[in-house]
């Protein structure tokens, strides 16, 4: 999982990427390609 300060560019890496908020942190998840995971912070 990548940790970045801005998720805007990581959201555009794949069309199936989606942004979710869990436990106060923002994540990018992709159910089809698991390697496109990222966390903001």
UniProtKB/Swiss-Prot annotation:
Provide the leader sequence positions. Answer: none
**Can you supply one Gene Ontology CC term for this chain's record?**
ribonucleoprotein complex
Q: Which domain of life is it from?
A: Bacteria
Q: Name one GO molecular function term.
A: structural constituent of ribosome
UniProt keyword annotation of Ribosomal protein present: yes
Keywords carried by this UniProt record: Ribonucleoprotein, Ribosomal protein
User: Transmembrane segments in this chain: where?
Assistant: none
Q: Which GO terms describe its biological process?
A: translation
Q: Which family does it belong to?
A: Belongs to the bacterial ribosomal protein bL36 family.
Q: Which HAMAP family match?
A: Ribosomal_bL36 (MF_00251)
Name the NCBIfam families for this protein: PRK00831.1
Q: What is this protein called?
A: Large ribosomal subunit protein bL36
Which species expresses this protein natively? Answer: Rickettsia canadensis (strain McKiel)
